[in-house]
């Protein structure tokens, strides 16, 4: 009796733990050995021939599905991160950052010493009246004079 070997790749290392003695078995483990010797080699004895254990097709399909789903998940996450970064770039940087509570307290205490109104929590353009450039200069000059007299 002549045996024709089919060339098949050995199972991947990750799938080797799923090898079983199910038909069809392709790779011959050893010729002219007993059933006991075949089992010692870790092979399957089927119809008088000692075959290497094989990974069933359904295990290959299942592992391929897992890889495809994991890949789709990773691609989705990457796509969302890219979209978020594009949205952040599209938003103008004109929005003022909120001040910390300690900074607000310092501003309020320094303005109360000088007799100024505390700063409003909103953006500068949200105030009811806008000061002209001359008023801003006057305030700056007043603060400088007050600091000189305290020293």
UniProtKB/Swiss-Prot annotation:
Feature: compositional bias, Low complexity: 107-119
Membrane topology, as annotated: Single-pass membrane protein
InterPro entries: TEX29 (IPR031685)
Keywords for the protein's UniProt record, in alphabetical order: Membrane, Transmembrane, Transmembrane helix
Keyword match Transmembrane: yes
Top-rank taxon, per record: Eukaryota
Membrane side Extracellular: residue ranges: 1-56
Location of the protein in the cell: Membrane
Stretches the record annotates as Disordered: 100-151
GO cellular component terms, A-Z: membrane
UniProt-listed Pfam families: TEX29
Cytoplasmic face of the membrane: 78-151
Name of the molecule in the record: Testis-expressed protein 29
Organism: Homo sapiens (Human)
Gene that specifies this protein: TEX29
């Amino acid at each position: 009796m002549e045996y024709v070997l089919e060339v098949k790749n050995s199972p991947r290392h990750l799938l080797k733990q799923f090898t079983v003695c199910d038909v069809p078995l392709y790779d011959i483990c050893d010729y002219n050995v007993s059933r006991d010797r075949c089992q010692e080699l870790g092979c399957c004895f089927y119809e008088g021939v000692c075959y290497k254990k094989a990974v069933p097709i359904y295990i290959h399909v299942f592992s391929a599905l897992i890889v495809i789903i994991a890949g789709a998940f990773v691609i989705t996450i990457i796509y969302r991160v890219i979209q978020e970064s594009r949205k952040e770039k599209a938003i103008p940087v004109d929005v003022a950052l909120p001040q910390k509570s300690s900074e607000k307290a310092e501003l309020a205490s320094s303005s109360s010493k000088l007799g100024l109104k505390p700063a409003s929590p909103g953006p500068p353009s949200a105030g009811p009246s806008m000061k002209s450039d001359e008023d801003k200069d006057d305030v700056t000059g007043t603060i400088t004079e007050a600091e000189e007299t305290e020293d």
